Regions:
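Short, surface-exposed secondary-structure edge patches
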Residues: 35, 54, 75-77
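Short acidic-glycine-tyrosine-enriched beta hairpin
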Residues: 69-89
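A short, N-terminal "cap"/entry segment at the start of jelly-roll beta-barrel domains
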Residues: 1-30, 77, 116
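Residue-level recognition of short, solvent-exposed, well-ordered loop/turn junctions
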Residues: 39, 58, 80-81
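Conserved short histidine dyad/triad with adjacent acidic residue
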Residues: 32-49
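Glycine- and acidic-residue-biased ligand/ion/polar-headgroup-sensing regions
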Residues: 51-69
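Short beta-strand His + acidic residue motifs that chelate non-heme Fe in jelly-roll/DSBH
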Residues: 44-46, 64-65, 87, 92-98
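Ligand-binding loop in jelly-roll beta-barrel domains
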Residues: 78, 89-113
């Protein structure tokens, strides 16, 4: 399982849910780099996963929330172009697109559910 050298224009785009499109870039079993677009108003509800998640916003603005479970939000804010973030392994987080947004995310370990797509 490895895609060492890739080009965004040559990769398959997958709509994960309405308004959210993912493109896998380079990855192996330990790490994964993905390109995402989100349509203004689309949301990812509070969730968590094993992978540490680092992101960098290329255009648009995201509203994020961090929580200590499904409901208790302890931090929220906005991230715009040039902004970056990191969510720890199993940290609950949510995202809403305040504009049409384009961003890159890095996961460690690679998200196996994304590789199958």
């Amino acid at each position: 399982m490895s895609n060492k050298i890739t080009r965004l224009s040559e990769r398959n785009r997958v709509e994960l849910r309405p308004g959210l499109v993912k493109t896998n870039l380079s990855y192996n079993e330990e790490t994964m780099l993905c390109h995402f677009t989100m349509v203004k108003g689309s949301k990812l509800e509070i969730h968590n996963h094993l992978a540490v998640q680092n992101g960098f916003v290329l255009r648009g603005r995201l509203r994020y929330q961090l929580a200590d479970g499904q409901k208790n939000v302890y931090e929220e804010g906005e991230i715009g172009p040039g902004g970056s973030y990191v969510w720890d392994s199993m940290e609950y987080h949510s995202t809403e697109a305040l504009d049409d947004v384009e961003f890159i995310e890095f996961f460690a370990p690679a998200r196996k559910e994304y590789i199958a797509e």
